[in-house]
């Protein structure tokens, strides 16, 4: 029996896939499962997505694409990692294709490799991609790659429909489309597609955080973080606990310890702010979160071996990644991907 684990909800994942499909029925999703499926464990998530009809996947690195093929994926797009010439037969066999993210690939000879490519155009993110204004380079890339060019894509810096940046970036992307070959897969939007107007020329989109339950009404968080109480004691009035005694008891207080800390990805900035769930309802986190342990104030009927919900929902309460993120000044993406791989992921 584990003393800490993360649960991946197959029902919530299914709900999210269905909602995304209902919202964007004319676009085929390319599921983004980078960074180990946003910390959910790609080995757990990818087979479930396949069961729900998702057949296309995207990751950042080629090594992750090779791993995904072991989980059953047969169409994988590498977003930002150059191919290796001695791996082309393996890429082809495993259905791996690559985004062209730098015009230098032309001079490096990478575009002559016998694999499929998507042209990644920088229209304003200014992070990676061939700049939209390098029209001669774009034409040359299309010519060299020829029928191995499978798609054209970009990444928006702001996907909200009322954004001036969106209007500017979409106009730039349209300019590139006007000089690109016809019949390509076209994808430039991510989970923000659920909010903004559909792009009439798009054939696909790349949902990421929405698959995992965040960013749009009706989505359900997929990952819960749980642990068992490993120690309990009564803290007397006037006594503090943990490093620096940042919390001090004003009355006899039942304290329980769980074996999760910032080494597991439970942020230290949650100290004296977080809540958790138990059979007795809400628990208040007290004292400084340490590397491997965290303490909570709890009713006396919460005892060693009891399950504590550190992230998730319970009867009468919830504390999800977006709520954690708000407390520590970050985004749910970072909360989810920070959970250490040493915490087992379990499909439920």
From Swiss-Prot:
CC terms in the record's Gene Ontology section: cytosol
Keyword Nucleus carried by entry: no
Active site: 34 (proton acceptor), 243 (proton acceptor)
Modified residues (N6-(pyridoxal phosphate)lysine): 34
Record-linked SMART domains: Ala_racemase_C
Enzyme class: isomerase
Name the record gives this protein: Alanine racemase
Binding positions for substrate per the UniProt entry: 127, 291
Cofactor: pyridoxal 5'-phosphate
Functional summary from the UniProt entry: Catalyzes the interconversion of L-alanine and D-alanine. May also act on other amino acids.
Pfam families hit by this protein: Ala_racemase_C, Ala_racemase_N
Highest taxon in the source lineage: Bacteria
NCBIfam families with a match to the protein in the record: alr (TIGR00492)
Entry's Gene Ontology BP terms: D-alanine biosynthetic process
